[in-house]
């Protein structure tokens, strides 16, 4: 049984990692002028705004629901990968995207015992 402190730390880290996706998805769904401007800057068609907003929101919901959190983390990782490629393509840095991905996975690792079993950070004692 994982410690309560570990799980709560994971929840806080997960929340902090997921938080930037909320206004990002909302602004896309509302077609905020800054999003339109950003898409133009990234040389992407405006027609992609709504589908990206829906995709981002669905990935975020999957991450927030405990039963689908691992799937959500995988989907958000893919979403961030696409965002990184888009930014790298025009010579922009991707530090924020990498940091968000680390936060998402670290939070999930701390709050999800099945993930810690799958990816142990230390060697298991195989005695006995």
Enumerate the language-model features and the residues they cover.
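Short hydrophobic/aromatic-rich motifs at helix boundaries and adjacent loops
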Residues: 6-10, 30-33, 53-55
């Amino acid at each position: 049984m994982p410690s309560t402190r570990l799980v709560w730390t994971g929840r806080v880290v997960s929340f902090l990692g997921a938080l930037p996706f909320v206004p990002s998805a909302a602004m896309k769904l509302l077609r905020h002028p800054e999003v339109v401007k950003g898409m133009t800057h990234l040389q992407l068609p405006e027609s992609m705004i709504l589908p990206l907003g829906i995709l981002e929101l669905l990935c975020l919901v999957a991450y927030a629901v405990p039963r689908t959190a691992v799937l959500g983390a995988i989907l958000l990782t893919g979403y961030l990968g696409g965002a990184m490629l888009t930014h790298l393509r025009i010579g922009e840095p991707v530090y924020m995207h990498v940091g968000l991905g680390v936060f998402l996975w670290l939070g999930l690792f701390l709050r999800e015992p099945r993930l810690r079993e799958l990816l142990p950070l230390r060697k298991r004692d195989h005695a006995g």
